[in-house]
């Protein structure tokens, strides 16, 4: 348990260092946000990529070569140097939590709230805009970042996650509540 907490703290420190580097030049804050988002996407789409970086018996030179092949010309040169530094310090296994922590730091700096919406069917742009506006009013955020996911098993409605708060307005959730009420009465 302690090792997980230590890793989390180390990842947070690396993300803070990345933020400090980003603040040193105009435009890097957003650029690094795009870079970390892209890296998270690559890790989501290719679990083998992340596994390759995590395995300790793979040579550091091979890990650096993979990073250059995957991200060279796609991320800012400072970011590529940062990734290679993580390899040198044997911290590249923390790439995902570092990227996630940086994204969280960036949202805080930009006063942006992250909301995840899981719906039974894809939301239209009008529905998404209306939802963003309601979340903005509810949280007093300057901006709202809406991540959408479709789960047909919800049957209808949606589940909205804003930070630690979960609003279950799905048909499946309503049926579950009704079933619970009927069994308790």
From Swiss-Prot:
Signal peptide: none
One Gene Ontology cellular component: proton-transporting ATP synthase complex
Localization: Cell inner membrane
Keywords for the protein's UniProt record, in alphabetical order: ATP synthesis, Cell inner membrane, Cell membrane, CF(1), Hydrogen ion transport, Ion transport, Membrane, Transport
Membrane topology: Peripheral membrane protein
Alphabetical list of InterPro entries matching this protein: ATP_synth_OSCP/delta_N_sf, ATPase_OSCP/d_CS, ATPase_OSCP/dsu
Gene Ontology molecular-function annotations: proton-transporting ATP synthase activity, rotational mechanism
Disulfide bond annotation, renumbered to this chain: none
Function: F(1)F(0) ATP synthase produces ATP from ADP in the presence of a proton or sodium gradient. F-type ATPases consist of two structural domains, F(1) containing the extramembraneous catalytic core and F(0) containing the membrane proton channel, linked together by a central stalk and a peripheral stalk. During catalysis, ATP synthesis in the catalytic domain of F(1) is coupled via a rotary mechanism of the central stalk subunits to proton translocation. This protein is part of the stalk that links CF(0) to CF(1). It either transmits conformational changes from CF(0) to CF(1) or is implicated in proton conduction.
Recorded family membership: Belongs to the ATPase delta chain family.
PANTHER family on file: ATP SYNTHASE DELTA CHAIN
Subunit structure: F-type ATPases have 2 components, F(1) - the catalytic core - and F(0) - the membrane proton channel. F(1) has five subunits: alpha(3), beta(3), gamma(1), delta(1), epsilon(1). CF(0) has four main subunits: a(1), b(1), b'(1) and c(10-14). The alpha and beta chains form an alternating ring which encloses part of the gamma chain. F(1) is attached to F(0) by a central stalk formed by the gamma and epsilon chains, while a peripheral stalk is formed by the delta, b and b' chains.
Family annotation (NCBIfam families): ATP_synt_delta
Name the record gives this protein: ATP synthase subunit delta
Organism listed in the record: Gloeobacter violaceus (strain ATCC 29082 / PCC 7421)
Lineage start: Bacteria, Bacillati, Cyanobacteriota, Cyanophyceae, Gloeobacterales
């Amino acid at each position: 348990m302690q090792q997980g907490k230590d890793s989390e703290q180390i990842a947070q420190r690396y993300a803070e260092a990345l933020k400090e580097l980003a603040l040193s030049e105009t435009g890097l804050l957003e650029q690094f946000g795009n870079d970390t988002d892209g890296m998270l996407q690559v890790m989501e789409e290719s679990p083998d990529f992340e596994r390759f970086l995590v395995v300790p018996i793979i040579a550091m030179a091979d890990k650096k070569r993979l990073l250059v092949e995957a991200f060279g010309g796609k991320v800012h040169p400072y970011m590529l140097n940062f990734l290679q530094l993580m390899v040198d310090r044997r911290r590249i296994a923390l790439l995902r939590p570092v990227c996630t922590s940086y994204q969280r730091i960036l949202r805080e700096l930009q006063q942006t709230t992250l909301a995840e919406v899981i719906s039974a069917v894809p939301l239209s742009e009008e529905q998404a805009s209306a939802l963003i506006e309601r979340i903005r009013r509810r949280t007093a955020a300057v901006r709202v970042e809406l991540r959408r996911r479709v789960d047909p098993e919800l049957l209808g409605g949606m589940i909205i996650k804003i930070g630690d708060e979960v609003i279950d307005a799905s048909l499946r959730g309503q049926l579950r509540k009704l079933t619970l009420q009927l069994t308790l009465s």
